[in-house]
Amino acid sequence: MELQDAIAAFDAQLAADGRSPHTRAQYARHAAALGRWLARTERSTDLAQLGHRALAAFVASPEARCRPDGVAKKATSTNALRTSLRTLFGYLADAGLMPANPARLLKRARCSPPPPRALREDEERKLLDHLAAEPGDAARRDEALILLMLRAGLRIGAALGLDVPDLDLAQAEAHVRKDKNDRAETVLLTPELVEHLRGFVGARRAGALFAGSDGERISIRHAQRRFAQAVLAAGIERKLSPHACRHAFATRLLAKTGNLQLVRRAMRHRSISSTAIYAAVAEEDVREALRAR
């Protein structure tokens, strides 16, 4: 079997397992990079000819370790590549398409995860003040979207997937039909957020919650561009993504409650290890405060 056919079979399995489009796309990118490296080094793409030595050589190559501009990738990026290869070839071995997993010897490098880049409170004020002063329906939509991420901790994809009927403002809830892992979840809304969303929704009873002038649901890419433009116009110098709003929600909730399990529930993390990164941020805040005394 050729590598390209194996990649297609692996992606079909990921889809059947309910893996998110983001996860599938990352696996596809890593597998495609391996294919390009095999072609460049004139190695066979036949699975029968692909062993652990070839995979080790690929992971050690500039294609795997450097960006297109030649700058070295972060250790976390290379670790993600190793994980993708182990998962891909583990599937091929389990499916009987290879006699064994040639990537089983690839080990993840030890590294600390980078701290989450959260929207600071002063940046939040600048951003919301800018949007409040902007005229037009698009600014009202952007403001509501950002508040939903800031006050409820939604991922941008989950927020944009909401329809108007998914909001139960009387119960202060939003019913997220498709989150990162295709799980149906109930998200709790603060009284302030409920009032803002009530004004934003108005008399609408159907359709996408966040729609463009044509009435169609806006895309994640469009929302990301709008967010970047608003950040720049608000005078915020740091480069931030919409996910900084979700990070801000978690960081502030932990600072307020000190309860990591509560934050895990609010963030809808399956594992507490995904939430623990915010505890490291909170500890650094304490150190900074002590140094300032």
Walk through the language-model features, giving the residues of each.
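Conserved catalytic core of the tyrosine transesterase superfamily
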Residues: M1-R293
